[in-house]
């Protein structure tokens, strides 16, 4: 039995299959964890969604920002982004079932047995483990069983950009969603900056990656995340695993085998920027 993590798919189905073939993935014995953003700019978003769903208990994803945007478009809250290639999902006969399944995926996965945390963008620098898990559960409860339409309709905001345990209602839920699905750079006072998406060397001096801030949790439990394609080939602290290596940007897809921490990569098999 082996445990694998893979970076953002974003509709890059062929590369995922090549990686799974290379490691001889066996869904009856192995487990595949995905860091979110199953869909968006690649040409096989429907295939990615259907495949991960078909694996059942052999796979576990978390929600990424593109996954949430797909749900928002399904609810007629937002329009499909010009570069997103998701028409096949909307035309699928089981469209409602696919969106229902996606909406029931978590924001955070914690395994005590395997000793990891996984989310799409990372863990807020102001959260300990208990807070991260309770915040994730709070929003997951609404997405899965509550007034998810109202939440998704009102989640598009960059405020509040700083955590406080006193946050309530939509402000609190927006912060939680942004921390788990959109966070990259922060100011030294832990405020989020959503404008900068550049490589680390090109970032303004006042900004630092979330994982370089002082949070004891970052050293207590290994954290696996995606979301940040421009981190490709950048060093990260011990126990911080950044798996989005920009396959949909014509770079490569990265898979990590957890037991021996061996990486596997697959270059993009097509020029996605041509679409």
Curated annotation (Swiss-Prot):
<comment type="similarity">
    <text>Belongs to the Ap4A hydrolase family.</text>
</comment>
<keyword id="KW-0378">Hydrolase</keyword>
<dbReference type="InterPro" id="IPR029052">
    <property type="entry name" value="Metallo-depent_PP-like"/>
</dbReference>
<dbReference type="InterPro" id="IPR004843">
    <property type="entry name" value="Calcineurin-like_PHP_ApaH"/>
</dbReference>
<protein>
    <recommendedName>
        <fullName>Bis(5'-nucleosyl)-tetraphosphatase, symmetrical</fullName>
        <ecNumber>3.6.1.41</ecNumber>
    </recommendedName>
</protein>
<comment type="function">
    <text>Hydrolyzes diadenosine 5',5'''-P1,P4-tetraphosphate to yield ADP.</text>
</comment>
<dbReference type="GO" id="GO:0008803">
    <property type="term" value="F:bis(5'-nucleosyl)-tetraphosphatase (symmetrical) activity"/>
</dbReference>
<dbReference type="InterPro" id="IPR004617">
    <property type="entry name" value="ApaH"/>
</dbReference>
<dbReference type="Pfam" id="PF00149">
    <property type="entry name" value="Metallophos"/>
</dbReference>
